[in-house]
Curated annotation (Swiss-Prot):
Subcellular location: Cytoplasm
Organism: Saccharomyces cerevisiae (strain ATCC 204508 / S288c)
Pfam family, one: HSP70
Further remarks about this protein from its record: Present with 170000 molecules/cell in log phase SD medium.
GO biological process: 'de novo' cotranslational protein folding; chaperone cofactor-dependent protein refolding; cytoplasmic translation; protein refolding; regulation of translational fidelity; ribosomal subunit export from nucleus; rRNA processing; translational frameshifting
Transmembrane residue ranges: none
NCBIfam families associated with the record: PRK00290.1
Main location: cytoplasm
Region called Substrate binding domain (SBD), residue ranges: 403-613
Role according to the record: Ribosome-bound, Hsp70-type chaperone that assists in the cotranslational folding of newly synthesized proteins in the cytosol. Stimulates folding by interacting with nascent chains, binding to short, largely hydrophobic sequences exposed by unfolded proteins, thereby stabilizing longer, more slowly translated, and aggregation-prone nascent polypeptides and domains that cannot fold stably until fully synthesized. The Hsp70-protein substrate interaction depends on ATP-binding and on allosteric regulation between the NBD and the SBD.
Gene designation: SSB1
Span list, region Lid domain (SBDalpha): 516-612
Protein name: Ribosome-associated molecular chaperone SSB1
Subunit structure: Binds to ribosomes. Binds close to the ribosomal tunnel exit via contacts with both ribosomal proteins RPL35, RPL39 and RPL19, and rRNA. Directly interacts with nascent polypeptides. This interaction is dependent on the ribosome-associated complex (RAC). Interacts with SSE1. Interacts with FES1. Interacts with NAP1.
Amino acid sequence: MAEGVFQGAIGIDLGTTYSCVATYESSVEIIANEQGNRVTPSFVAFTPEERLIGDAAKNQAALNPRNTVFDAKRLIGRRFDDESVQKDMKTWPFKVIDVDGNPVIEVQYLEETKTFSPQEISAMVLTKMKEIAEAKIGKKVEKAVITVPAYFNDAQRQATKDAGAISGLNVLRIINEPTAAAIAYGLGAGKSEKERHVLIFDLGGGTFDVSLLHIAGGVYTVKSTSGNTHLGGQDFDTNLLEHFKAEFKKKTGLDISDDARALRRLRTAAERAKRTLSSVTQTTVEVDSLFDGEDFESSLTRARFEDLNAALFKSTLEPVEQVLKDAKISKSQIDEVVLVGGSTRIPKVQKLLSDFFDGKQLEKSINPDEAVAYGAAVQGAILTGQSTSDETKDLLLLDVAPLSLGVGMQGDMFGIVVPRNTTVPTIKRRTFTTCADNQTTVQFPVYQGERVNCKENTLLGEFDLKNIPMMPAGEPVLEAIFEVDANGILKVTAVEKSTGKSSNITISNAVGRLSSEEIEKMVNQAEEFKAADEAFAKKHEARQRLESYVASIEQTVTDPVLSSKLKRGSKSKIEAALSDALAALQIEDPSADELRKAEVGLKRVVTKAMSSR
């Protein structure tokens, strides 16, 4: 890599199933990985020798299912006892354990049992995306804009920001995926001077968002947003997998539920069938020797696939209705409906959406896999002052808080301070008081959600306001100040008005929230793993070089024509050096240095022997 640091910031779409990275240097470029693919699987695999990330990890998943981790985005910022985590754990081949209420992934790596938080796994994927960008730019990358589903809550946003920090990136901004896609659309095929309402329908591998934006010139104002952080292509694959499992059991009497390798192979076949059915109406699924020597073969029509996922497909219209209702806009006022995310390629999803908008033609002009990273790169260029073109110079992004924020009051009532769809950044205030005479401490539990009963919302954390002057109940004036930054992350302050006493917290004991010490420790660990990866690669390279050199010299020594030209003494010296080199290859775990020394030693003897012929 050339010296120097990239002055801009890369845009990373950190996806559930695939990730994508883009950079802006006078224009946006989506960067391909070393395999030439413009999207990289969000997979990390651990083996006795090394760690693999991206395509290499996904390609060996069937051989190493228990130590191949994916779907980290479905764990990040969630509690272990979260209903969706418990449901997902039944389908994942890797092990998830409970550590202080947080889900942690347990794997075998370098012949030891290791545990990683979802943030650390996501950080490994982010590091990979950073390296892909560095290989193209030729400079060190330090800054990034990372995208998250619009419907991610505070804990999920903070955990994603922490993942960025662990990967060694300065995360300038966390932006919402549909908003990033809207930028890509507004600067690309959807370029227009007229004011319009645009609905972004973003259905990816694991998450689903709908955002309604008003675009006027370079000002993008999000009017409302809704979604489901646990709906996407993975769920359609799971339904297909269950169907195929039942079919295999019916035909053979064999149940593959507990065989991680068979499940992985069948899931891969299900995913392939799903993709194929977007362009044809029937496909055949074949998996040789799936389980107990029995082959699996099945014919699947598009109609059957649609039937298996009918309820999920239909559920995608609920957030569409919600955003229209929240923005107080009728569907006839929507000028464009833009498709984003790989799962919007499914014909039935497109038909349901088009029918909902009375046969409206859907906008398919932007690449559904790349639009989010594109928008993030534009935002990165704006934040680092690298955007020079007129169209990006005046671009302004006004996003919203996806869920209401507030405090728990007496009787578990939810007191909303920041209503959902409030434009961020924002500061909102609300006054409270004491419930008992002479009460000197009030606890403020902070929640996020839309339910009246606090217990049905997400607890983000709690704090105490102490040393309140003794007064009759209802007299003290306590003000809660909620500050939401441009990343959608919350800071809360409470003040007792008569004394000015305040308690200021950035929610500390929230789920999935890492302390700065924990982040620092994980950053150091990430560096160690990276160093171990590099050492392994060097060793592998040194071994390959030595093996191929040994093979070529062995050929020389055994070739009667070539060996006859060597003096007898020289030949025996080469054979002795060859034997030393072979011994180095036989050592159980030789270092790259030992292998290099063996190669240099052999080369020295051979060069000397050849020159004295």
